[in-house]
Amino acid sequence: MGNVFFLLLFSLTHFPLAQQSRCTLTIGISSYHSSPCSPTQPVCTWNLDLNSLTTDQRLHPPCPNLITYSGFHKTYSLYLFPHWIKKPNRQGLGYYSPSYNDPCSLQCPYLGCQAWTSAYTGPVSSPSWKFHSDVNFTQEVSQVSLRLHFSKCGSSMTLLVDAPGYDPLWFITSEPTQPPPTSPPLVHDSDLEHVLTPSTSWTTKILKFIQLTLQSTNYSCMVCVDRSSLSSWHVLYTPNISIPQQTSSRTILFPSLALPAPPSQPFPWTHCYQPRLQAITTDNCNNSIILPPFSLAPVPPPATRRRRAVPIAVWLVSALAAGTGIAGGVTGSLSLASSKSLLLEVDKDISHLTQAIVKNHQNILRVAQYAAQNRRGLDLLFWEQGGLCKAIQEQCCFLNISNTHVSVLQERPPLEKRVITGWGLNWDLGLSQWAREALQTGITILALLLLVILFGPCILRQIQALPQRLQNRHNQYSLINPETML
């Protein structure tokens, strides 16, 4: 068994398992592993496909009541942010200040609202990220190459797609999560002629679409409208929403989600409908699309094994075993000595008690002798009446004092020879006292030696790896771009 153990120890020390650390990106139940990265090689890279991410999001949505989005006719440029952020510069060169919120609290289809300043994504103070040093990416149609600093692994991110004129590609259903309140009357076109021009038909469609959007989201969303692009929009997707026929409203087609006709560029919205104010204001709004949130988790690298000299380990384990055995033997001997002294003291107490009982027995015998003498004297006095018992008409009593129990107690062997010492087992085996003690000590040393052989190498490895762990804990992550000082 010892040869098998040392052969296993030799194979583990000379053939360590090498595995590099990675960062895992999780969407639904799908996992995407990055390229090998670590504090010394801090760039984690993924090659992602937007269509696959969309499928993962649709099959396994991260939130139970999240409104899903539809497909769109072309892939737009991406903006990559930490989970819910403010972006002061749209050229991708400024700081990205994360403001973390729960993505499952989304309630709006979020038409025309600015993603990073919308009402339900209020900012929360948190550390800043820089685009080129902490996170960056490149895109070719639907393929995205994502690069993340290893120190940011473990955070959450969201991909935002900049879709010109169209916020976002949510699919609006006709069954809201809770019954909406009574809708206010639809705004008349005549009240908006100074804002919405030049097409009355498109104006009516947009207003009706805003109204249906507000109803489906329980009037908790902001809807934005751009005046300059109303005449150039075209129908992209028609959701299956039933429209109740009202005599006061015009007959229109199904409301449509729209995009500006190519080659329009991203533009700021100029007018926004505020549900709380129930009016269209001239706030500046931007547009974006929210793709599924990402959950990042670092994969800890396995502990590296160093090559060690087997003879040193053998001698060290043997020395530990011998030392432990000697310590166990000394401890066992001291324990046996203390047990013997305790038995001797108990034996002395028993002998004293026996002597006291014997003395009391002797005193009782003397008293019995005196009583017998008095009995004989009384019998002589009542001899003419037939004796004492017949004279007092009582049953005669005779005293029989026995010394058997005391003699049995005195004849028993000493307590040390009758009590089993050690582990509570019957170690008699017909051996002498010193032979039994030697047998117990030998078995104790053998058991301790086996324990040291089994657990000694593991303890040694942990002790040798402790300085390296402490050193790695105090190392700071290096940055992709040292000039950013992040």
From Swiss-Prot:
One cellular component term from this protein's GO annotations in UniProt: virion membrane
The keyword Membrane appears for this protein: yes
Region (Immunosuppression): 372-388
Gene3D superfamilies reported in the protein's UniProt record: 1.10.287.210
Any coiled-coil regions, as ranges: 337-383, 393-425
Keyword entries, A-Z: Cleavage on pair of basic residues, Coiled coil, Disulfide bond, Fusion of virus membrane with host cell membrane, Fusion of virus membrane with host membrane, Glycoprotein, Host cell membrane, Host membrane, Host-virus interaction, Lipoprotein, Membrane, Palmitate, Signal, Transmembrane, Transmembrane helix, Viral attachment to host cell, Viral envelope protein, Viral penetration into host cytoplasm, Virion, Virus entry into host cell
Site location (Cleavage): 308-309
Regions that span the bilayer: 439-459
Residues carrying lipid (S-palmitoyl cysteine): 458
Signal sequence, start to end: 1-18
Glycosylation sites: 136, 218, 240, 286, 400
Quaternary assembly: The mature envelope protein (Env) consists of a trimer of SU-TM heterodimers attached by a labile interchain disulfide bond.
Protein name per UniProt: Envelope glycoprotein gp63
